[in-house]
Amino acid sequence: VYSSKIEGEEIDLDSFIKHKKYGIEFLPDYTKKTDDLYTAYTFAKTSVLNKKNIEEAHKILSRHIVAKHLQGKIRTQNMYVSTPEGRIEYVAALPSEVQGEMEKFYHDLEILLQQELTTSEVFFFAAMIHLVFVKIHPWNDGNGRSARLIEKWFLAQKLGEKAWLL
């Protein structure tokens, strides 16, 4: 829920718990994106952190965000983040660079997953994974949601299941 709220979703934790636990129905637009994110986290909890599964997680979490043909696919357009006033705050990797940057990202991720790391190193690299992913901004939308999921996924793979509760 908090990952969804960062993206501007209006749903609150109490409402989402009532929706998931007790089946209380809300207007579909109120819960769809958060439901998708919940499903992506559920998928991640039972899947290995790798390229194929990250792309699948994006397909799941972006079901109600981007068109089906863009889900889990690398973007081919320029990407930037702007303020509500329209001022550009950040320009992501150029479309011609995204594929290569993601190949490096997945290669480095694979190496980190194989390394014995201290707890401090795990937290450091989890934060770096998040940062590098959002700097590349590989998807048309859902980059922040994906980065937060990948960060938590990495923590859980390295520290165990309880890391999902952080």
Go through the PLM ranges and name each one.
Residues V1-L166:
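FIC/Doc superfamily catalytic core
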